[in-house]
Amino acid sequence: MTEHLERNKKNVLEFYDLMFNQCKAAEAFEKYGGAVLIQHNPSVPDGAETVIEHFKGMEEVYPGKRAHFVRVIAEGNYVVVHVHTEWPGERDGASIDIFRLDDNGKIVEHWDVMQVVPEQSANDNTMF
């Protein structure tokens, strides 16, 4: 069981790094994407090709963007990643991405929630 969870965490982190940090979305899907991708982000249609195009556009608008992985949690076929995102020219972001993987460790489903890190907070805690 532990090997399965560690493999899934590794696959998701490598997928995310290729997609976001290295700007190699097509390679990320080739290595880690399943036969289908069910997308729950309302701004992005289902399927690898639409996500690849979405990330190509993001690369042009935010060159030098960077994702830092804060926490990674795996249970069953799900991996949850807490991410600190640097957006050049914009405020940083905090996000939670949830991935479902198939039995072969390939990514087949994705959810995310994102928010901007505010300049001031009502408490002394960080978002990370």
Question: Which ranges hold each PLM region?
Answer:
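C-terminal and inter-domain tail/linker signature
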Residues: 1-128
